[in-house]
């Protein structure tokens, strides 16, 4: 009986180790680009089909291959596709993805409307 338990444990470890480095899901999103737009979440148009964003970034050789690829925040500003370049969690992907970080914009706008007196913090001593 102990051999059956050890055998099933060995099979479990073998299967877990074999799927550790695989990416889940298909690279395509299951639709074609309609007027350059994909309607599936986490997908973008890579003509003629919609592909997952991380697949587009992994296959790209330069930032200019897709309008949302970036290496810095400045790339997003220059392309006009956002104000924040977020990197993918996979370290093998050398490009990031441009986003519109609205909260950052609102914070900057609120900061610019503040007077200089608001920025000075009073020093209070508590004993």
From Swiss-Prot:
Probably participates in a plant defense mechanism. Displays insecticidal activity against H.armigera. Has weak hemolytic activity. Binds to phospholipid membranes. This is Cyclotide cter-M. There is a cross-link at residues 25-53 (Cyclopeptide (Gly-Asn)). Cyclotide cter-M is a cyclic peptide. Residues 54-127 form a propeptide. Disulfide bonds join 29-43, 33-45, 38-50. It comes from Clitoria ternatea (Butterfly pea). Coiled coil: none annotated. It is found in: Secreted. The presence of a 'disulfide through disulfide knot' structurally defines this protein as a knottin. Displays an unusual domain structure in comparison to other known cyclotides as the cyclotide is followed by a C-terminal albumin-like region. It comes from the Eukaryota. GO terms for cellular component: extracellular region.
């Amino acid at each position: 009986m102990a051999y059956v338990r050890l055998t099933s444990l060995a099979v479990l470890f073998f299967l877990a180790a074999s799927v550790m480095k695989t990416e889940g899901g298909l690279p395509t999103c299951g639709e074609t680009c309609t007027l350059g737009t994909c309607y599936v979440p986490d997908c973008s148009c890579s003509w003629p089909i919609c592909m997952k964003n991380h697949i587009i970034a992994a296959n790209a050789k330069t930032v200019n291959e897709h309008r949302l690829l970036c290496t810095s925040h400045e790339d997003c500003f220059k392309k006009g596709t956002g104000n924040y370049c977020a990197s993918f969690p996979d370290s093998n992907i050398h490009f990031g993805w441009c986003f519109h970080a609205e909260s950052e914009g609102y914070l900057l706008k609120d900061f610019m409307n503040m007077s200089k007196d608001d920025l000075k913090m009073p020093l209070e001593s508590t004993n």
